[in-house]
Amino acid sequence: GCIPYGKTCEFWSGPWCCAGKCKLNVWSMTLSCTRNF
């Protein structure tokens, strides 16, 4: 499967985001899937 928006993710190992990219959330300091591509 894929990781939905807002959920935590990793750059280097899947599964990857359903949409958007895996980016650092500056507020929570965790990697999460973004809404956009």
Swiss-Prot record:
PTM section of the record: Contains 3 disulfide bonds.
Subcellular location: Secreted
GO cellular component: extracellular region
Free-text comment about domains: The presence of a 'disulfide through disulfide knot' structurally defines this protein as a knottin.
UniProt superkingdom: Eukaryota
Modified residues (Phenylalanine amide): 37
Described function: Blocks the Nav1.2/SCN2A, Nav1.4/SCN4A, and Nav1.6/SCN8A sodium channels. Reduces the peak amplitude of the sodium current and negatively shifts the steady-state inactivation process. Does not shift the threshold potential of activation or the voltage corresponding to maximal current. Does not change the reversal potential of the sodium current. May act on site 1 of the receptor.
UniProt organism field: Heriaeus mellotteei
Disulphide connectivity of cysteines: 2-18, 9-22, 17-33
Name the record gives this protein: Mu-thomitoxin-Hme1a
Similarity remark: Belongs to the neurotoxin 01 (U2-agtx) family.
Tissue: Expressed by the venom gland.
Entry keyword set: Amidation, Disulfide bond, Ion channel impairing toxin, Knottin, Neurotoxin, Secreted, Toxin, Voltage-gated sodium channel impairing toxin
Note: Negative results: does not inhibit the sodium channel Nav1.8/SCN10A sodium channel.
A GO term, aspect molecular function: toxin activity
